[in-house]
From Swiss-Prot:
This is Two-component sensor PprA. GO terms for molecular function: ATP binding; phosphorelay sensor kinase activity. It comes from Pseudomonas aeruginosa (strain ATCC 15692 / DSM 22644 / CIP 104116 / JCM 14847 / LMG 12228 / 1C / PRS 101 / PAO1). Member of the two-component regulatory system PprA/PprB involved in biofilm formation by controlling the expression of many related genes including type IVb pili major subunit flp pilin, adhesin bapA or cupE fimbriae. Functions as a heme sensor histidine kinase which is autophosphorylated at a histidine residue and transfers its phosphate group to PprB. Induction: By carbon starvation. This increased expression is controlled by RpoS. Residues 1-10 have a biased composition (Low complexity). Residues 506-558, 632-684 form the PAC domain. It comes from the Bacteria. Autophosphorylated. Keywords: ATP-binding, Kinase, Nucleotide-binding, Phosphoprotein, Transferase, Two-component regulatory system. Gene3D superfamilies: 1.10.287.130, Histidine kinase-like ATPase, C-terminal domain, PAS domain. The modification Phosphohistidine is found at H700. Disruption phenotype: Mutant exhibits similar responses to carbon starvation stress suggesting that PprB-mediated transcriptional response is not transmitted through PprA. The gene is pprA. It is an enzyme of class 2 (transferase).
Length: 922
């Protein structure tokens, strides 16, 4: 076996060596030298002794066989000769593997022969202190330099570039100590460490990269810096990372968290030449704590910024109260939100109470003292005296907990702005009160039934139940309610509950007895509500008393025959037709109006008797028919045989099937033919009355060209008696005479057209032509009365649809009224009438303006001027029909006639719809 010498007692226990040669030399060497090796000629160790032999590491399982001397070596001193030099008489400094933290370095003397069998004696003195002190100082200086680099590099780097700076530091460590990979891990305080930054040499493959995460227990496999190797016991850390060897340097950070440096060396020899474990420990703890402090500082700044932002957004913040000084310290945002001044944000309790409503201020003082006395939490809602910028009350919520004791006794907590919540709560309470009042006063009964194990248990009935049934249903069971159901309706009542639980919705009708025993027909509609898990929780429904509807249905059934007879014999024209205008029903009155029988009319199309325009409008209305209600058409004109016409005021109601599609239309017509004829006669009479008023002006208009003709004939006679008539002179006079004759002819023709009855058909025409025609008849008369007429040509010609002569009649009536108003005001310096065609802002319309400066219309009379027989003229000067007839004529063309005071006189506006583009183009 190998021999280890620690002392004389240890030597007595040492096994016998292989050889007994030179015992005196061996014994003397053991006492004088730190290490003694007996070597064979193949440089194998036979036995070991000396004062420091106990420090050598011993391999396991070697047995008693000689061991090569090289296995005892840790590393060779730089620049030393080889082992063979010892045999040549040279000295050599060697470092041997030691079982302690510090290596064992010895200076060996040249080998001395021990016997004649080739054995030698190798003697060494321990120089570890000298050698280790030199290496240690060098590594400490290098560690201090790297520590200075760490501090300077991390001092001013921003948090966003912190990982990059740490990576540069790790790269410097890797370059200084020849490492393949190095990583800094920081613990999260939850049992895990994460790689914060790392450096891996190019070309190396390593998992030591962010975001690798390791358990704290894996980094606590041993105490202090240590080398982990697969051959020296199992390591969970090595298996996780997939490395054969790692140098682990745990670092304890402030707060008890764990950090570490994980190093993958280039080789074990390079690691041995690097810093001592305590230097690695120094670098690891310095770097880990610096990085952790920077991260914690950033988190504190970020949390402070977020807290400040949150306090600013919610209008609140933290507070602290010192009981002995009765002084509040407020957060900056809270201090500013309360409108307080002062540098230190400290407010006396009395000052803070002055900001509150008196009742809240007194209560706050009492609650503060009670909380300090009992140690219980403080919570109160406070209302400020001053309203906010919107004039609304401002509410705060103060909450706090006692802290400290003795002179440091106080409270600390938060103060939040709950104004919006209080306003919403007040609105919700008001809405709840309104809703409760509405529910209680509603003509229906609202109820809630709770679902318990498949049963519907009554829970709530609105107060209207007592008004409807004369019963207090609150607290009554489902069985008590079922006993009040009519016996014939019990099956429907039971089926209602099953359908509600199965389908989630139900609608049914049944009879229920009230407090006096009278039966009420109830329409019951309910919906099932479910909880977050989708299970039925309660049913909400309503009862509607439909007793009157049932009685009405019975009465309707009894009188249906009477109503059918009434419809048949009704003086109104009643029919039904499909969306294609095919008649499906016609009453007797309608058939008689069309001079045929109802049977012969069924199946025929309604548009056979209608003009194309009316038929198209009727179809368009059917396409946009409302779902409910009837629509009334002003009039429909039916063309009857013998050039007869039937004017009907038409009211129609669309009927829809279950799918919401139009299936039929029911229409009722009222014969308006006599009224229509009377309107035509009235319009014609008004037209002739206008002609009568224009006689004097027309006489002058006819007399003037006749006078020109007379003068021309006189001149021709004089010329013929004196010098005779030549061709040129005669041609000139004849042309002049012809022009005057044409002038009279146009005037007479226009009078003939104007005096005829208006056509029934609406035709497209230019509305500006009404201005031209009216001025042709009234222009001369207006000029005779010194009335200036302005009629600018329109920038764009428009086309409307209607009767051109009727629009001209309207303009004539408006011009005549303007003339009378101007002549009835003798104080006017000038008399003006302006006719203008104006395009509307609303597309599809055009306006004709007639504006005078005659002083306008009294405001109280504006609403009555279109009434029949109403006039502002003196008695005997007007019929009161001009404006009324004009209003009806414009309305029949689909337009409107309005009057207003504007400027120095009255403004009449005729508003007409433009014709379709196809008609305008035609």
């Amino acid at each position: 076996m190998f021999e280890f010498s620690r002392s004389s007692s240890a030597e007595a226990e040492r096994p016998e060596p292989f050889s007994q040669e030179g015992p005196a030399l061996w014994s003397a060497s053991l006492r004088s030298w730190d290490l003694c090796f007996e070597m064979d000629e193949q440089d194998r160790v036979i036995r070991v002794g000396g004062r420091q032999a106990y420090r050598l590491q011993c391999a396991h399982g070697l047995g008693e066989q000689p061991r090569p001397f090289a296995e005892y070596l840790e590393r060779r001193a730089p620049g030393a000769p080889t082992l063979a030099g010892l045999r040549r008489g040279e000295r050599l400094d060697l470092t041997l593997r030691s079982d302690a933290a510090a290596p064992l370095t010895c200076r060996f003397q040249p080998m001395q022969p021990l016997d004649g069998l080739g054995r030698s004696l190798l003697l060494g003195m321990d120089i570890s202190d000298l050698n280790w002190q030199s290496d240690s100082q060098q590594h400490q200086l290098q560690s201090l330099s790297l520590g200075k680099l760490i501090l300077s590099r991390l001092r001013h780097v921003s948090h966003g570039h912190l990982a990059e700076a740490v990576q540069e530091i790790l790269e410097s460590l890797s370059g200084a100590f020849q490492m393949q990979a190095i990583a800094l891990l920081l613990g999260d305080g939850k049992g895990f460490c994460t790689v914060f930054a790392s450096h891996v040499r190019p070309g190396s493959d390593s998992l030591l990269r962010p975001p690798l995460q390791l358990a704290d227990d894996d980094l606590r496999e041993g105490a202090g810096a240590r080398l982990l190797r697969r051959g020296e016991g199992a390591s969970t850390l090595l298996r996780q990372i997939g490395e054969d060897a790692l140098y682990l340097v745990p670092a304890t950070m402030r707060g008890g968290r764990l950090g570490a440096l994980l190093v993958r060396p280039m080789s074990l020899e390079q690691l041995a030449q690097g810093p001592a474990p305590q230097d690695w420990q120094y670098l690891a703890e310095l770097l880990a704590n610096q990085v952790a402090d920077r991260c914690e500082l950033h988190e504190q700044h970020d949390s402070s910024r977020k807290l400040g932002l949150l306090q600013e957004m919610i209008g609140g913040g933290w507070w602290r109260y010192w009981a002995e000084q009765e002084l509040f310290e407020l957060a900056p945002a809270l201090h500013d939100s309360l409108g307080l001044t002062g540098e230190y944000r400290r407010v006396p309790l009395e000052h803070l109470q002055g900001l509150l409503q008196p009742a809240d201020a007194d209560e706050l003082g009492l609650r503060l003292r009670a909380s300090l006395r009992s140690g219980q939490a403080l919570a109160q809602d406070l209302c400020l005296r001053q309203p906010d910028s919107r004039g609304e009350r401002r509410w705060l919520r103060i909450e706090g907990r006692p802290l400290g004791r003795g002179s440091a006794l106080g409270l600390s907590g938060v103060l939040l702005d709950i104004s919006e919540g209080r306003r919403q709560e007040e609105r919700a309470q008001a809405a709840h009160a309104r809703l409760r009042s509405l529910i209680d006063s509603a003509p229906v009964v609202i109820y809630v039934q709770r679902v318990e194990q498949g049963h519907l248990v009554p829970e709530f009935y609105s107060e209207s139940a007592s008004n409807l049934l004369g019963l207090d249903l609150q607290g009554q069971s489902w069985q008590a309610l079922a006993e009040r159901v009519h016996p014939d309706d019990l099956e429907a009542f039971f089926a209602r509950g099953r359908e509600l639980l199965r389908e989630g919705r139900v609608k049914t009708r049944y009879r229920l007895a009230d407090g006096q025993g009278n039966w009420h027909w109830l329409y019951d509609e309910a919906k099932l509500l479910r909880d977050a898990q989708g299970l039925p929780s309660e049913a909400v429904g309503l009862w509607l008393d439909v007793t009157e509807q049932h009685l009405a249905a019975q009465r309707i059934a009894e009188s249906e025959e009477r109503y059918r007879v009434l419809v048949e014999d009704s003086p109104a024209l009643i029919c039904r037709y499909t969306a294609d205008l095919v008649l499906t029903y016609v009453n007797r009155t309608f058939a008689d109006s069309l001079a045929t029988s109802p049977e012969r009319l069924v199946g025929r199309r309604l548009d056979e008797w209608l003009a194309a325009e009316d038929a198209s409008a009727l179809r368009a209305r059917l396409l946009g028919s409302p779902r409910e209600g009837a629509s009334e058409v002003p009039e429909l004109r039916f063309n009857l045989p013998g050039q007869r016409f039937l004017w009907l005021v038409w009211a129609e109601r669309p009927l829809f099937d279950a799918r919401g599609e139009l299936c039929e239309v029911q229409a009722v017509g009222r014969d308006n033919t006599p009224v229509r004829r009377a309107q035509q006669q009235l319009a014609q009479g008004a037209k002739m009355a206008s002609l009568g008023e224009m006689v004097s002006g027309l006489a002058h208009e006819v007399k003037q060209p006749l006078h020109v003709l007379r003068m021309t004939l006189f001149n021709m006679r004089q010329r013929m008696n004196s010098v005779g008539l030549d061709g040129d002179y005669l041609g000139e006079k004849l042309e002049r005479m012809d022009a005057q004759v044409l002038r009279v002819d146009r005037l007479v023709s226009h009078l003939g057209v104007f005096s005829r009855k208006s056509a029934l058909e609406a035709l497209p025409f230019d509305p500006y032509a009404a201005f031209e025609g009216a001025l042709g008849l009234l222009g001369e008369g207006l000029r005779q009365h010194a009335i200036e007429v302005e009629c600018p040509a329109p920038t764009q010609r428009m086309v409307v649809r209607g009767q051109a002569d009727q629009l001209e009649q309207v303009i004539i009536n408006l011009l005549a009224n303007a003339r009378d108003a101007l002549l009835g005001n003798p104080g006017l310096a000038s008399r003006r009438v302006r006719l203008e065609q104006v395009a509307c802002r609303e597309p599809g319309w055009v306006e004709l303006h007639v504006h005078d400066n005659g002083g306008g219309i009294e405001p109280l009379l504006l609403e009555r001027i279109f009434e029949p027989f109403f006039t502002t003229k003196a008695e005997g000067k007007g019929t009161g029909l001009g404006l009324s007839v004009s209003h009806d004529l414009v309305r029949n063309m689909g337009g409107s006639l309005t009057a207003a005071n504007q400027g120095e006189g009255a403004l009449f506006v005729v508003r007409l719809p433009l014709a379709a583009p196809a008609e305008a183009g035609g």
